[in-house]
Amino acid sequence: MALHVLDEANRCLGCKKPLCQQGCPIHTNIPEVIRLLKANQMDAAGQMLFENNPLTTVCSLVCNHENQCEGHCVRNRMPSHDPVHFSIIEDYISTTYANKMTAGPAPKNGMKAAVVGSGPAGLTIAVLLARWGYDVTIFDARDKIGGVMRYGIPNYRLPDSVLDDFQYRHLELKGIKVR
């Protein structure tokens, strides 16, 4: 494990009322993710992140952490202290865990679903529907998935390789079709 990530995790105070989680728009259980990381349960931490947010790898790079989880961190209230930089922790866990993801599609429920658009909302619902057993097809006007993530966010901020990897690990391996 990268030492700088563990050092960052060790800075977490383990608050009883985690303001970081309240500051997260999708209420990621940040204290539990950090606890699992510190307990060397990387797969459990990664699974928790991806179950809560299929786009966790993307969010670790582009989310406005400074005004959300990190901006709400109680360490900000202490003189000359920086918040726990969860963006570093989330990026490390989600990237490491994503590189191991190989599981195939969930058992089918016999129902089909069409998703129009492969932007953040379309990709998220497609992954969730596939988890619930739907046979999912995404319809998009562009050749590559991602919508605003690919065509609106600069490559230096969100590399195309992250979205290409998402397509392989979360769509192709799960049997989600893209047209």
Where are these regions (language model features)?
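Ferredoxin-type iron-sulfur electron-transfer modules and their immediate structural context
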Residues: M1-K112
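Beta1-alpha1 glycine-rich phosphate/pyrophosphate-binding loop at the start
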Residues: H27-A39, L49-F50, H72, R77-S87, ...
